[in-house]
């Protein structure tokens, strides 16, 4: 599934054009998986766009940031109001919102000493994820133990084994991996 673009992205407190939302290749998160995110579904209703459990998603966003000792320089209320404004600016009905925070550009090394935490909000139009029946196969890769990371946090680095599992089952003609 390709990405449907929008007009604007919110980055570190500013609305920027989609094509200008970029990071440096030495961004810490690209090398070490030091990013956190959420996925919030948006639904077109008669009263406008409804955001599914936005408050709870932003609460978990801060929980996940704390797990990686990230300092989010924006208040919860500011992120929520920025999501709502971004939805309007991008004219999203049915869609998807991706709050993202990551250790940015600063040094090359696992420990993110003196590296800023960058925050972005992305809102794109998005309908149903699946539009047909799925073929699912159990993967030989297993889910990470809850004791191998911070339980309940959405840490991007935790998803590497899910990528491996998807490659494995797709090569065998299946749509999704069960872990």
Model-predicted segments: where are they?
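Helix-start/capping segments and mature chain N-termini
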Residues: 1-74, 81-85, 110-179
């Amino acid at each position: 599934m390709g990405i449907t673009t929008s007009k604007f992205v919110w980055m570190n407190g500013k609305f920027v054009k989609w094509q200008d939302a970029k990071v440096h290749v030495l961004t810490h998160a690209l090398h070490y998986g030091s990013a956190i995110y959420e996925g919030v579904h948006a639904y077109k209703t008669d009263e406008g766009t409804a955001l599914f459990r936005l408050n709870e998603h932003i609460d978990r966003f801060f929980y996940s940031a704390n797990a990686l000792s990230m300092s989010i320089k924006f208040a919860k209320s500011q992120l929520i109001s920025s999501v709502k404004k971004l939805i309007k600016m991008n004219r999203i009905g049915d869609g998807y919102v991706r709050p993202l925070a990551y250790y940015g550009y600063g040094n090359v090394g696992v420990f993110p000493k003196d590296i800023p935490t960058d925050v972005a909000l992305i809102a794109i139009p998005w309908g149903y994820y699946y539009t047909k029946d799925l073929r699912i196969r159990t993967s030989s890769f297993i889910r990470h133990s809850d004791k191998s990371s911070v339980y309940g946090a959405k840490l991007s680095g935790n998803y590497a084994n899910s990528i491996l599992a998807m490659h494995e089952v797709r090569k065998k003609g299946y749509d999704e991996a069960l872990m």
